Structures are given as C-alpha cells and as structure tokens.
A protein has these predicted regions:
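Peripheral interaction segments used for macromolecular assembly
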Residues: 1-127
Length: 127
C-alpha cells in the first residue's frame, strides 16, 4: 500500500511520523528489516515514551503502510489501542527475526491492514 514516488532512498523515510486515519501520531520510523528475498519486510516503529525514553519498537509489515495525510508522514490504518497489543520489543533486546514463529505472529496480527485485505480487526491476543 506504500504509494510513494519510486525509486527513493529508504533513508528519506527514517524518522518519518506515522499517523492513523484519525491523524493521531502512532510513532516514528526508526529502522527497517529486509527479508530473505532482499525486499523491505518491516518498518520498525518507535511507539510511546517521551523523547525516545520508555518507547517500544513495533515491527510493521512494510506493505501495511501508505503515504500519510500530511506531507512528510506515513499512514497506518490502525487505532492506538490495537497497535499497543502488537508484538513489540525494547531497543536493547532485538528479537531473532529469523525465527519463523516471530514472522508468522507479526504477519497474522497485521493481515487486516495489508494491501487488498478486508478491514477485519485482528483478534486480540493473537500475538
């Protein structure tokens, strides 16, 4: 769903604000993960906290993101409460992204928000 001018540098998306359809700030993009196929798999969203203190990192499937409503933003069609239930980790304890279970849980949780998906809500506790 990422409808941005391509090609573009990934670095242009670092520190970009991510908002939902209600224009609530969900966080900022802090990093990216590349899959085994060489494509961008996840945008790593910094969420919560204050000035980077106390925040958690949430891997968001790259294809769940869209251009934002405001210039210089990216949009994710999810409410804050649902986002807060997603798998997350602290910046000092990155998970093993090669673990199949981790990928499956993330993909299952965000399936409703990927391009072409129906607008069903993820099942709470599915991660």
């Amino acid at each position: 769903m990422m409808e941005i001018k391509v090609p573009m540098r990934v670095s242009e998306l670092l520190k970009t604000t991510v908002e939902n359809r209600h224009r609530e700030k969900l966080g900022t993009i802090q990093d990216f993960m590349v899959g085994a196929d060489g494509r961008l798999k996840y945008a790593i969203l910094s969420h919560g906290g204050f000035l980077g203190i106390g925040d958690v990192l949430i891997p968001i499937p790259f294809d769940a993101l869209m251009t934002g409503y405001e210039k210089g933003t990216v949009s994710l069609d999810i409410d804050k409460q649902t986002l807060e239930k997603a798998l997350s980790f602290e910046s000092k304890t990155w998970p093993d992204f090669t673990a199949v279970e981790w990928d499956e849980k993330i993909d299952r949780y965000f399936a409703a928000y990927k391009a072409g998906a129906s607008q069903q809500q993820p099942v709470a506790g599915s991660v």
